Amino acid sequence: MGRIIKPAFTVIGMEGSTADGHGFIPALWETANSRFGEVAALAKTREDGSLCGIWGAMSDMNRSFRPWEEGFTRGLYLAGVEVRDDAQPPQGWVRWDIPGFEYIRVENNAPDGFPRTLKMIAAEGLTLAGAVHDFTDPATGKSYMCFPVRKL
């Protein structure tokens, strides 16, 4: 666990909603992964050419990047890749411009990681400043949950 500062960034991906029913997130990833070639050239890369990040970005239903509503059961999800700021989505893809935040970043390796981190945030007198995002670091293959605690 640690804190990171992430300035505003852009993700292009496949968007879905909890209204789409159980299993919508894996279905989004299946579609995004199978069509990745359509956005690969737009992806933001590091100096070594590796991708900067794969994001499971989340937002409230109004796309204002607030936490999911109704006890974290109602919201939007974007399965995608971090892209250059000037990138435009191909047909069928969606672009989200995610505001900058300070995040508490926790490795996503335990089923109780989400509620446990929410309790820790509350114990420190903090609150969520936005929606939690899933992040996979392509360089290491590790997955993290990013809990925003301060908007930049």
Label each residue range with its predicted role.
Residues 1-152:
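A solvent-exposed interaction/effector surface
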